Amino acid sequence: MGAYFLKKQARSPILEGFGRNIYALLSFSGQQYFIIAVCIYHFLLGNPSNFMNNDPNNHPLPGNFLGTIYKGGIIVPVIQTLLLTVLALSIERYFALRSAFGKGSLAKFVANIKAALAAGDIKKAQEICDKQRGSVANVVTSTLRKYEEMEKNTSLPKEQKLLAIQKELEEATALEMPMMQQNLPIIATITTLGTLMGLLGTVIGMIRSFAALSAGGGADSMALSQGISEALINTAFGILTGALAVISYNYFTNKIDKLTYGLDEVGFSIVQTFAATH
């Protein structure tokens, strides 16, 4: 176990090459994302050229999407922060999991390992792992080393050897899983938070609309329309952010489930091979 941990610290595929650069590029804090969102809101969406008479207090130009979003009000930068976070973490997770899967097809890797084990060729199985790399290959390599260690051990009974191999598989998997699941809880939180922020913006917009209706006993048409626009824009923006977060979370969770299933399949084959040949 200790040897596996040291090896992992020295060479983790998730922290290598392009994936490492992507992770460094996207490792902003929530505060930094908020600053970016505020800049987008004021300087891009709130650009005077998006509005009638070059005045952000007026209605957006007909068909001007940027000006329309700007009218969503103060909640828009908050929802933009959540949206930027989802997009950035989704990109980071994509490259991280691509590295975790290794260089080749996971299904083909599992099939090749099982074929090598069926032939009793542990050395070939290790060579396949060296070519594949990634988290799955790391776990299998660690388990195969324990396999060879138990083969040379003459003091332990067969049952304890099998338990030792199984334990090594579980511990190696437990070390890899946190990195594969990193940032997914944040995306899962945004699935709800994005919708709630949209709802908050909707409520604020409706409050402004009713305030315009009640002011002076008559309706200020511009204030009324701005309040309704704010409500609808925030609703749409919040739902969009929540939907993207749900899609991202489910996609990456499914990828991790496939990887875990592959590990379980290979691990079972290793244990069964040892049980059948010793």
Task: Name every feature range the model reports, one short phrase each.
Residues 78, 126-129, 203:
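Hydrophobic alpha-helical membrane segments of integral membrane proteins
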Residues 102-194, 208-211, 247-278:
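Predominantly long cytosolic amphipathic alpha-helical stalk/bundle segments
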Residues 9:
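Cationic, low-complexity basic patches in intrinsically disordered or flexible, solvent-exposed regions
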Residues 39-62, 68, 177-255:
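Helix-termination/interfacial motifs at the ends of transmembrane alpha-helices
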Residues 20-108, 252:
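Hydrophobic membrane-targeting segments
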Residues 15, 53-62, 155-166:
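Short, membrane-interfacial amphipathic segments enriched in basic
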Residues 73, 87, 125, 140, ...:
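Residue-level signature of catalytic and energy-coupling elements of molecular machines
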